[in-house]
Amino acid sequence: MKHVLKNDWGPLLAPEFEKEYYRELDVFLKEEYSTHVVYPKIEDIFNALEYTSYENTKVVILGQDPYHGPNQAHGLSFSVQPGVKTPPSLLNMYKELRDEYGYDIPNNGYLVKWAEQGVLLLNTVLTVRQGEANSHKGKGWEHFTDRVIELLNEREKPVIFILWGRHAQAKKKLITNPNHQIIESVHPSPLSARRGFFGSKPYSKVNTILANMGEGEIDWEIPNL
């Protein structure tokens, strides 16, 4: 599962692929992919980093582990492949977006448009066994994605971290650089969205911060496919 990242993440993360934890993770993943159905496809594991380079990252939306149903996961947190029903948490994200900006809820959950504008859609665990949420938790991915967060924390140019729910908020300890901004609320999951996600206006908060920095704002509207 070693991967040559084709943008500026490549040299930054190359040392991770040589560390003992990643070698053990690599052995585990080869076994998992050869004996079980695992998501996403091998070639999609690092899509978040491929779509959103280090220098171009303006915003990070932190997720947990990939969707574990057929044809859903493709390497971006919260996003699903075209032609797949929009999952409940993402539907709530769209409802909040509609309330903030008046955008219609799209007919898909394909968030590549966000990634291409500098929104790093990063899960803390990058693979999962079909039908078994958190099945690859504690196997090494957390070390790797913590390093991604640490590298962004080291950047002088500000990054806006969106932390929804306790799992994402546990990563706050890695964000120590005062240049960066944190936006947080409960998770958009149907279990918690009404306890403070709805009405939290994360998308317009991001764009206000970007505008104040003289940076281009994110066009959050996802087109129909």
Swiss-Prot record:
Family stated for the protein in its record: Belongs to the uracil-DNA glycosylase (UDG) superfamily. UNG family.
Molecular function, one GO term: uracil DNA N-glycosylase activity
Lineage, uppermost ranks: Bacteria, Bacillati, Bacillota, Bacilli, Bacillales
SMART domains reported for this sequence: UDG (SM00986), UreE_C (SM00987)
SUPFAM superfamilies: Uracil-DNA glycosylase-like
Single GO cellular component term: cytoplasm
Keyword Protein biosynthesis among record annotations: no
Group of enzyme by EC: hydrolase
Protein name listed in UniProt: Uracil-DNA glycosylase
Entry's localization field: Cytoplasm
Major location category of this protein: cytoplasm
Catalytic activity: Hydrolyzes single-stranded DNA or mismatched double-stranded DNA and polynucleotides, releasing free uracil
Native organism: Bacillus anthracis
Active-site residues, record numbering mapped to chain: 65 (proton acceptor)
One of the GO biological process terms: base-excision repair, AP site formation via deaminated base removal
CDD domains in UniProt: UDG-F1-like
Disulfide bonding pattern of the chain: none
Function: Excises uracil residues from the DNA which can arise as a result of misincorporation of dUMP residues by DNA polymerase or due to deamination of cytosine.
Keywords, alphabetical: Cytoplasm, DNA damage, DNA repair, Hydrolase
